[in-house]
Amino acid sequence: MQNRILTLGAAVAMLAAGLCSCSEKETEVATYENNYEQTLVQDDSASVQISHSIQYYKSYEGGRALRRKINDAIVRSCFGEEYVGLKVEEASDAVSDTLIANYQKDAGESYDEYLAYSKNNGNDYDWTPATFCNWYYRTVGAFGEKFMNLQTYQVFSESYTGGAHGMYYSIPYIIDINNGEIVTENDLFLPGYVAPVTGLIKEELESEQGSDTFETMFQDGMVPNGKCGVSGEGVTWFYQPYEIASYAEGIIKVTVPWAELKPYLNSECLKL
């Protein structure tokens, strides 16, 4: 029962609409889906569930070398720097193996501590520490909007590893489809951009949220935070739970139009 259970099997290829050619001369998007579950050694009523759904390029009109570089950027965005060089499915398996090993160690230790505490305090009611040891991790990576040579790749992740509630994040990455490199916020803007762009972000937030709500938010966090994506409209910053508002407010997005950002953009990265 302790062996890893592969619940969905291998990759499921989902072709992009209207694309049917398998030629490297055309672009084909696929989605790799993987689901794992493993029970806790101490109690098989507790388990960890791991789910990955990752879009990547199966073929790319820019050629194989560029496709590999873009897919490396996707692996880095979804799984981390240490997995670059692996295919999406290989990275998914490697990450899952690590998470499962960590679960057995960390959740196992928590289980033993909960159980010892319960016994030491004479708890005789029907309670099991397995309640806090049902963990999960989910990662979804998908192509977002695109502007000129810049492609937004959106990574949503959520997890529960014990405690009152889980956590979730939605983080965009910008990939230059001309060279496969990840474009950071510092690449996108000229030096000295932080102060003026902070002002633009606050103006947009106050306009969208309303003055009363805006005043209750965490003003110190309303800065360019490096978690931004691009679209035809402008640059969108994503603020995670607790970053500029309470957990209940969730993920907050704010878009600043290109026209307002133009004086601060790095023309070597993006020419408007």
Segments predicted by a language model, with ranges:
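Bacterial N-terminal signal peptides that target proteins for export
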Residues: 1-9
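Compositionally biased intrinsically disordered regions enriched in Thr/Gly
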Residues: 22-272
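C-terminal motif of bacterial Sec signal peptides marking the signal peptidase cleavage site
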Residues: 17-21
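Repetitive helical segments and hydrophobic/amphipathic motifs
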Residues: 12-13
